[in-house]
Amino acid sequence: MRLVDLLKGVKHEIKGNPNVDISGVCYDSRKAKPKYLFIAIKGFKTDGLLYVEEAIKNGAVAVVTDRDISEYPGVTVVLVEDARAAMAKIASNFYNNPTSKLTLIGITGTNGKTSVTYMLKAILEQQNNKVGLVGTIQNMIGDRVIPTTHTTPESLDLQELFSLMVNEGVKYVVMEVSSHSLALHRVDSCDFDIAVFTNLSQDHLDFHESMEEYAKTKSKLFKMAKKASVINIDDKYSSMMIESSKGKVLTYGIKDFAYVMAKEIKNSLSGVKFKVQIQDKKEEISLKIPGLFSVYNALAAITVADFLGIPLRSVREALSHVTVKGRFEPVETGRDFYVFIDYAHTPDGIRNIMEALKEYEAGRKILVFGAGGDRDKSKRPLMGEVAGKYADFCILTSDNPRSENPKEIIAQIEEGIKKTNCPYVVIEDRREAIRYALSNAQKDDVIILAGKGHETYQIIGDKVIPFDEREIVKEILAESEK
């Protein structure tokens, strides 16, 4: 493919031969090969500009950059306004605009993205469609799993994945869209058909300057979706998403009047039942994941299905089987108490999970949690305060401390929990914290291990240590039987 064809739709200046033949594109100099185009993007930890020479040495014949660089003999230099934005368009051109051949559904919001994608995948597959999934836990084509590194991969990886999906006969793609991916142009040049808004609460304020900025970034998705926007009307940021919408707006909710509504909600530890109403249509829905947040997630999926013309009866059948790894996931203990694993790692996430247990009074609600290092620090005391308000007992521990001191992270959570009357202990080692919870559990207690969810590792310093809470619970219980 000629360089000039790859640059269609990209504002640029060229120094060198615009007709040079390009056989591949990369943003990692180690992946450069003869006849490759290297795109120098600025990352969080390093800068592609530092690796231009290495890319050329490995065979790159052209370089895209948004800053001036030295000229290299025989190498074409393309100067653009924003290398990340340019990469998204170049990637789409290189892979022949794969999203134009797919029905692409993007889901954004602080909480619920993963559950909604899995619910939609189940609904669409029940209609015998081949479905692709792009998400936090994994990427999938049908039942085949493709490992992930970010919630949303870089635009080049994403377009390659979409191209693979097209080649394998995928019709629908359900995709989690993070605020980072919108801000960093990773999903530019994605041809979204439907955008879904779940909710917005405090998270990622280490990256976005304020909640308004965070919301504004999320709203970009609704400008991109050409057919429909599906919006949680009960969320205070819904009006911003509605104003940004280009396609048909469909709302869902529980409190305020909406196109799709849930009534007669009955919650228990084993799931939640409710009646869904879409104008004059009604159906009873049964979910295996309990809680009001679960009802909201299902409503989002139901609204999309309704827009796509899928019968409500089929939707009911598909939703009755859905479970999501690390989302209110029960762990079999063989004891007289309960253990659940959940990804809740924000104040709102913790509130949602504890609200789901609100009516449960048979035993104590014990919460084991920490907060991630090198991430939004302002949410830590809020997490402590919310936990203290809802739990009967808390065990403060480590999550993924990364480069931070775990003791300091825990101290910041403590500031919040001290504002409540909730008794708590601090056990920095997460395995020992889980051991303490299990060994002190009484009949009918519910233990929530919050924060890790689907993750099977812990990041301490720069080391990634295997840490699967399902296995750890089993090991500790087996040890106690000896």
From Swiss-Prot:
Its cofactor is Mg(2+). GO terms for biological process: cell division; cell wall organization; peptidoglycan biosynthetic process; regulation of cell shape. It catalyses: UDP-N-acetyl-alpha-D-muramoyl-L-alanyl-D-glutamate + meso-2,6-diaminopimelate + ATP = UDP-N-acetyl-alpha-D-muramoyl-L-alanyl-gamma-D-glutamyl-meso-2,6-diaminopimelate + ADP + phosphate + H(+). One of its GO terms (molecular function) is UDP-N-acetylmuramoylalanyl-D-glutamate-2,6-diaminopimelate ligase activity. UDP-N-acetyl-alpha-D-muramoyl-L-alanyl-D-glutamate binds at S29, T151, T152, S178, R186. Keywords: ATP-binding, Cell cycle, Cell division, Cell shape, Cell wall biogenesis/degradation, Cytoplasm, Ligase, Magnesium, Nucleotide-binding, Peptidoglycan synthesis. Its EC number is 6.3.2.13. ATP binds at G109, T110, N111, G112, K113, T114, S115. SUPFAM superfamilies: MurD-like peptide ligases, catalytic domain, MurD-like peptide ligases, peptide-binding domain, MurE/MurF N-terminal domain. Carboxylation is probably crucial for Mg(2+) binding and, consequently, for the gamma-phosphate positioning of ATP. A motif (Meso-diaminopimelate recognition motif) lies at residues 399-402. The keyword Transmembrane does not apply. Meso-2,6-diaminopimelate binds at R375, D399, N400, P401, R402, G451, E455. GO terms for cellular component: cytoplasm. Pathway: Cell wall biogenesis; peptidoglycan biosynthesis. It is found in: Cytoplasm. The modification N6-carboxylysine is found at K218. Catalyzes the addition of meso-diaminopimelic acid to the nucleotide precursor UDP-N-acetylmuramoyl-L-alanyl-D-glutamate (UMAG) in the biosynthesis of bacterial cell-wall peptidoglycan. Belongs to the MurCDEF family. MurE subfamily. This is UDP-N-acetylmuramoyl-L-alanyl-D-glutamate--2,6-diaminopimelate ligase. The gene is murE.
